[in-house]
Amino acid sequence: KDGYPVDNANCKYE
């Protein structure tokens, strides 16, 4: 999304 560290399986570098 914004480039924040991937914490969730659906919140990676998208």
From Swiss-Prot:
Family the UniProt entry places it in: Belongs to the long (4 C-C) scorpion toxin superfamily. Sodium channel inhibitor family.
Alphabetically ordered keywords of this record: Ion channel impairing toxin, Neurotoxin, Secreted, Toxin, Voltage-gated sodium channel impairing toxin
Record carries keyword Secreted: yes
Entry-linked PROSITE patterns: LCN_CSAB (PS51863)
Function: Binds to sodium channels (Nav) and inhibits the inactivation of the activated channels, thereby blocking neuronal transmission. Causes prolonged contractile paralysis in C.partellus larvae. It also has significant toxic effects on B.fusca larvae but not on mice.
GO CC entries: extracellular region
Comment text on domains: Has the structural arrangement of an alpha-helix connected to antiparallel beta-sheets by disulfide bonds (CS-alpha/beta).
Name under which the protein is recorded: Insect toxin PlIT
Subcellular location: Secreted
UniProt keyword Secreted present: yes
One of the record's GO molecular function terms: toxin activity
Tissue: Expressed by the venom gland.
Lineage: Eukaryota, Metazoa, Ecdysozoa, Arthropoda, Chelicerata
Residue ranges of every copy of the LCN-type CS-alpha/beta domain listed in the record: 1-14
Source superkingdom: Eukaryota
